[in-house]
Amino acid sequence: MITQKISEELNKALAKMGIHDTQETKILVDKTKNIKFGDFYTNIAMILSKKNNKSSLEIAKEIANNFEQDLFLEVNLQPPGFLNFKLKAKDHENLLKQIYYEKDRFGQFSKKNITYNIEYVSANPTGYLHIAHAANAIYGDILANLLKIYGYDVETEYWINDAGNQIDKLAMSVLVRYLQLQNINIQLPADAYHGQEIHLVAQTLYQTYKNQFINVRLNEKYEIDDDIANQEIKNFAVKYLLNEIKNDLASINTFIDTYTSENWIRNSGRILEVLSKIKPYTYTLDGALWLKTTTFGDDKDRVLIKSDGSYTYFTPDIAYHDYKFNKTNTTKLIDVWGTDHLGYIARLKAAMNALGYDPNNLEIVCAQVMKLVKNNQEFKLSKRSGQSLTIKDLVEIIGKDALRWFLGSSSMNSHVIIDVDIALSKNNNNPLYYVQYAHARANQVLNKQVYELDFKTDLLTETRERELLNQLHFYKQTIANAANNREPHRISNYLYDLAQIFHNYYANVKINNDNNKVLSAQRYTLVWCVKQVLANGLAIMKITPYDQMY
């Protein structure tokens, strides 16, 4: 990785200068904005000037003088203190060989012996997945792919909230619809689940059990008055809807490794184990058991067991995270939540602290709100159900590739707006089309005639050829940056930039030169490598690379 090579040489040069604190100083190595200055640059001299009471140019010159000779074709200085590096043709040749021989493995890093557990989606199994869940699912899925490619072992996980009031309400809603199917005069309460999927669960329940529950009723609290029937209906409804959730996720190419049940955690004895572990940080007040989360930075203490003896939502969640940390080889946890859970972060980290875990090994990322617009008007309701847009609706409207692109190309720090007209357009205004077209165009060039490959780059002197080479060099660094910063959108940004350079190259440079077969071979090799890297980047996002546009 060329950026790593430059960073290593910078550290050697700085060590010769007596500067050894570079671990605290983030060395930026990036592509130059203007190719005439060089291929890559660093701003380290400007950072160090503030610490060493020297001008940036003076430090940059001293660094350059301490570089080993012949490492780069050229090292030059640019005010106010940039160090620019022009690469040798051999660096480019080695890159093209690596891409060609590694093919779809290009971009993968060596194993790091660290295992991440990434939990995402984790919607209550009370209905179909909706528009907000799509953003959560796609972010988590692409992040998992990134971390795997970056060398980590990764397990993905879904926390099934199959206990508590919402599941009782689900069973009650299904029972009412089931009884209505048999012409029983009973009304569904206003605060019950009214979605189309509840009708489908009830119909399937009837097909399976016939009239077994026909005499079951609700009490004055709108609770099912038969404990056995209540449990059977709950189990049936959760299983049915969880299967629908898995189908929804599969429709957007998302497959989660492990589904962990809250009921299982509750019945496994793990909650009692956790309560024993954190006992030194608990106290009783007003008949309730509290955890002293303020000891670890929370704004107030939190209830674990209510005065009626029931657990709060917090308690099984603590046990669940303890379970995840205790899985074989699990080192770090990442939870992907919605923004409505922002206030929950401090208390969960405090609980991990109380359990003796490093709270920094639990990362929590919150997905932002997303919306769909068409003709500047927001889509809010599904035509099919009259309710919030589901993942099924989104796939039907714009397709899974477009959904993965537009959600995967958005920062988690900003609201996501998907313009349907742009997402469906087949022109350069659609960034996904633009990138897929670059792959198809490269494929078209390579299939047009028989060509030879030549990994040398001495004849690739066009500005756009150097820009393409530098962008290819930066692919692995982009993966590292995206993985380390938990920013999957860096991949789509990279692909768009690569596509843009390639489209400009195609429009301005004749790739096949009948008068110079060696030049043609070098250009075909470059195009082959561009196509491969486009395909590899799209694979991280689980998006189809087209060989021809339709």
Curated annotation (Swiss-Prot):
InterPro entries per the UniProt record, alphabetical: Arg-tRNA-ligase (IPR001278), Arg-tRNA-synth_N (IPR005148), Arg-tRNA-synth_N_sf (IPR036695), ArgRS_core (IPR035684), DALR_anticod-bd (IPR008909), Rossmann-like_a/b/a_fold (IPR014729), tRNAsynth_Ia_anticodon-bd (IPR009080)
Predominant subcellular localization, coarse grouping: cytoplasm
Molecular functions (GO terms): arginine-tRNA ligase activity; ATP binding
Location in or out of the cell: Cytoplasm
EC number: 6.1.1.19
Superkingdom of the organism of origin: Bacteria
Enzyme class of the recorded protein, top EC level: ligase
Catalytic reactions of this protein: tRNA(Arg) + L-arginine + ATP = L-arginyl-tRNA(Arg) + AMP + diphosphate
GO-annotated biological processes: arginyl-tRNA aminoacylation
Subunit note: Monomer.
Name of the protein this chain belongs to: Arginine--tRNA ligase
Species annotation: Ureaplasma parvum serovar 3 (strain ATCC 700970)
